[in-house]
Amino acid sequence: MGRLSISLASLMVVSMLGSTATAFDYKDALEKSLLFFEAQRSGELPPDRRVNWRGDSALTDGFEQGVNLVGGYYDAGDHVKFGFPMAFAVTMLSWGVIEFEKETVGDGDGDHLCWERAEDMTTSRTAYKIDANRRGSEVAGETAAALAAASRAFKPFDAKYSNLLLLHAKQLFTFADTFRGRYDETLKFARKFYPSSTGFHDELLWAATWLYEATNDQSYLSYVSQNAVAFGGTGWAVKEFYWDNKYAGLQVLLTKVLLQAGSAPYSSVLKQYQAKAEFFVCACLQKNKGHDVKMTPGGLLYFDDWNNMQYPQVCPVPG
């Protein structure tokens, strides 16, 4: 498939979905997806919550370790708060706000053995951390990306809060890059739930890309250019985008930088990112000549048997 702008790809996705399954109410599905996040909230809930059968829960998370970890989102039907995928969810929600503004903690083993209401939980609220000795660049990098993206989303509405998010995003990126290491080698229990199959290089590139989006600081663009080959940014041609593999997302974001600004000093490297972004978009649009993403008869992109909905939910944002 020839050169394809991101805006054209977006139009094609809308057209393809509309012609494939016009009977489905996508507006209702979108509203339900946001309601799901509201139902998954941990901590003190506001009085105007729409999920009225949910109440306050886990109000002392982190206190045993001397930190305040109250709040956030539960992972699934259990009550674990996995920072790695939770940060990715925040990044993607923030990206959605940016692009469509006008339209729009626990022990895994013990927790999975007991399924109950969060308000009634009695299982351990063990907290695990990363630091300079117990490294976890994936978690720190993804959280940096989440805060940078959220900073960008909040900037038009709350400049003070946006600046605070950006400050911590920069700090976390520096930490992730300085003390490099895989989080699932430090926190070995995490391998059973959220193993890092792609390592931490994609998270470092992803975080730097979002920091460039939030700041326009050329040093971050220099980072993704200098590390493009070594970190796989211009080497990985992927057909999936999810909490563990950020290559497609960062490739699309950097293509946007190229198309909108040119970025002359780095244009040759950005064009390599663009080529990989086009591979991903074309695979989703069934235009990749034998290297397409599978699709169900109803028009749903199908990546994997296990928890497949996580993939098509995020693909429309970079696409």
Q: Which functions belong to the PLM regions below?
A:
Residues 1-8:
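Bacterial N-terminal signal peptides that target proteins for export
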